[in-house]
Amino acid sequence: MTKLKDPRASDIDNPSKIQSLFPPHIIGRLKNLESIVLQDCQLLEVIFQLEELNFEESQVASVLDQLRELNLYNLPKLMHIWKKGPERIRGFGNLRLLVVWGCNSLTYLFSPSIAKLLVMLEEIQVTKCKKIEEILIRAREEEKEEKNLFHKVNSILLRDLPNLKCFCNEANAFEWPSLKKMMVIRCPNLRMFVPSNLKTPELEGVYEDIEFKTSQWKGDLNATIEHIFKGKVWHILIAIISLMEEFNTCV
């Protein structure tokens, strides 16, 4: 298995100061890379710089087809995992696991054009990313709406994401035929999963703890997320009322 555990494996002298881990001239050389574990690069802004990839008109870009795992930890300046590339791009078709932890400048994970490449993605974990508002952003005008996304995803963990509002704000009819585990832990602004009907035939509940002890289910994923959100709001209101009563008693 070919792994990259530290960016110094790419002949980078000071990994804490790099801004783009895989610029265009390097990406094409990493055909056998299977696993990436990246941690504590304080100035890194982009993982995969696809924006400046140049190919002949007759060619189709194919990048990192063997990559199976991508683990990103404590990258405070990271703004893009994938920065947009040519429409004809192919790649990342074997990625199974995506872990993102402590990336406080990220506002989203995927664009639709990238998500459609991730046909084998099985597990998504997003933890302690303060600015993330959506996992999948809306399609740009030049992008086609994609409905057949995330068919292999069987596990999603969303944890300690204070600004997360939804998985996606696009009213697509998403289907999740493989989704079995869904964990939502301390995401106080998550009011819905997607603004449309969705099918999750294998999902039986949404867990609110990492040990899989407590789950909720209200018939579908959107209704369950909404129920959890309302429950959190109700608990906060009760706590505020209790504090006010204690204050008035003291006065």
Which residue ranges define each predicted feature?
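Cross-kingdom leucine-rich repeat
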Residues: 1-251
